[in-house]
Structure formats: structure tokens, C-alpha cells
Amino acid sequence: MHYHVTLHYVTIHHVTPHHATMYLLEHDAKELLAQHGISVPHGRLIGRNDTIDRHVLPPGPWMVKGQIAAGGRGKIGLVKKAESWQEISTQLQAMLGAAVGGGLVGAVRVEQQVKAAHEAYIGFLLDAASGGVRVILSDSGGMDVEQVPRDRIHSAVAAPEVRDLVECVRKLAVNLPGDISKAVVDAGEKLVPAFLELEAVLVEINPLFVLESGGWIAGDAKVITDDNALPRQRALESLVKTRVADYADVARKHEHGFDYVEVDPAGEIGLLTTGAGLSMMLIDELRAAGLKPFNFLDIRTGGLRGETKRLTQVLQWIGAGKKVKVLLVNIFAGITDLGEFSRLLVTALETAHVRMPVVARLVGTNLSAAREVLAPAGIPLHTDLDAALDAVRKHLGKGDE
């Protein structure tokens, strides 16, 4: 699940959930930013099991917005206008529980429509290469921001300090029309401290509604934070604890101590892997080969400590995947003893009652011992990834493709 917006020569790579990040739902992003002085439309969150009371809604007309952790919702039917309570009800029925982009819409935000004179764009993105923050402004925002001409996008990198970032916004905003420039600068002065205080990876307002009065309102808000900062971010920590269904991946990581993300509920290949970078590369390899991975996992073999609990838990999660047909184990071990790992794996497979075929690709220390353990369990061991993928294809009935 990669999220990115390409603004011609400026590309914002919205970090994937398994990059130790927490992608907030729009409603939560707006509620959090409102606490930092950001103007947002009045709205309410409605869940699948909520009793809907029209009297708690703000005055209409409204926007009905399905809540998923992804951009481009307007293009997939998750952002609709409503002029009446009946239209709201119809949209809620259509959106709640809908399967979209590998997940389900668990909640909908109903908020006031905003009558804007103009739609602009402002974003702040952590720039790992420079150690700074990239500031991006445009006088043209909205659903088709990717199509904005190059000369209307203004970007620069500044140090992660309030004064430096605000100054960067002011300098870039000189390139915008006067009324839009003033609104963008004002919004930037409030967004900068919010970005830093939240320890965010990305804060993006698109569109930033510029009003006839010269004021502004955040039409949509995208916030991605570093989930390693949760112990310092009480509001975010509370979200994870009280809304586990909405932030299941982050909740799992902080409860169990490793990264596990279901990337595609329709995925056919369960992955037992270690190393975040290698695991992401494997997912890319599978997709490029036309195969469908079910999950991302960085099991962190060093944390097993001779116990099967972590492996068993992961295998149970993978086994719950309705479409999963084969398990691919891909471990590149430096310090980890592959013989010991294989013994733990075989025990965990038995404990978790895994009945699907298992293909193992192992590289590293004590490989011969691993082979001796896996062979009696009927698990073929490969050291070459292509050979392992060929075995996976055969189990999926795709051996001749």
C-alpha cells in the first residue's frame, strides 16, 4: 500500500504503513490539527454500528467522506455531496462496510460543505536525505493536484525548526497570487508547529480552501506520524488503544514488538520474513511477477529468544487470511542460527495448525542444520529466490506462467 502524489518535478512519497508510521484517518487528522489552531469544517464521525442522530450533525449542506488511510478517495467514490438527510443516509449505506483498496470502510465523516473562492495546496514532508523538511506550496489544489503544471508548484527544504520553516513558507508564498499567498502563509504559520510537535512524517492540506473573506479552512487533511513517537504522543497513543480496528497494524506492533501489516485481504501468499527493507523488496518482487502477497512482516528473528510465541502468533494471523494458499518463509540471517530458527518454525507450524504448503528460502548461518530440520517436515529449502518463487507458483497452480 504505497501512497504518493506526484507533482511533476516534486514527488511526495507517502510512507507505507510498515515504515514505522501511523497514517491517520482524515477525521482524526482534522480533530488533532484543530487542537493546534487549524481551521477545519464542523463534522461528525459515524461508525458502522453507530446510531445516527441527524440532530448532532452540523448545518447543511454536507460532504460525506468515507474514512480510509489513503489518498484519492474522491476518485473512488468515497467523497460525495449531500443536500438532505436522505442523501446522507443513502451515502452512508453505500460507503460503510464497502471494500476499497484492500480494506473496509469502517467509518464516515459527515461535515459542512465549504464555499471557497479558491483551492490551494500546502504540505510538509520529512526529507530523510537532507535531514530537513520539504515545504511544498501551490495555488492549485484539489482532487487533480497531480496534474498541476510545474511552474505552479513551489518547493524547498528547510531545517526542522519553527522559524526556518515559517520563513521558507513565506519565501515560497511570494510566488502565489496575493489573496492566496496571505492565506497560505497564515495556514503555514499554524501548521509548522503542529508538524513538529506531532513528530510527523507528513502533514498535507489539500485542498486548502481560501475564502472570499481572505480566511481559510482545511478541506482535507493528511497526517502521517512516526509511530515510534507514540509514548510521547498521548493523543495518538489514545487513538491506537481506543480505536484498535482503525489502527490495527500500529496496535499490533506496539503490543507484540514487531511489524505486521495485511497489505491485501485477497492475497494468496502469506509471508514470514525478517528485515523491513528486504521484506518490502520481496513484496515488490511478488507483485512484479503477478503474484499477490497477503502481508508484510518484519519478524525480527533476534527477538525470538528461543521461543515460538511470536512465530505462532504470526502464523495464526496469516492462517486467518481467507485467500492465503501458501506460506513463503524468506530469512536472510546474519547472526541468527538457521538451524535453531527452523526448529522453532516447525514447532510453531504444528502449534498454529498450519495446513497450507510451506516454501522456505533461507540464507545465512548453519544452513545445513536448517535443511536437516526442514526436510523431515516436508518443507523444501531454497537458497535462490527465483527457485522459491517457482515453488510458490506451483502451489498456486501457476507453474507454467
Model-derived segments and their meaning:
Residues 3-4, 8-9, 13-14, 18-19:
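Intrinsically disordered, low-complexity repeat/linker tracts enriched for polar/charged residues
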Residues 323-364:
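C-terminal hydrophobic structural anchor segments
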Residues 21-205, 209-326, 363-401:
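ATP-dependent carboxylate/acyl-activation modules
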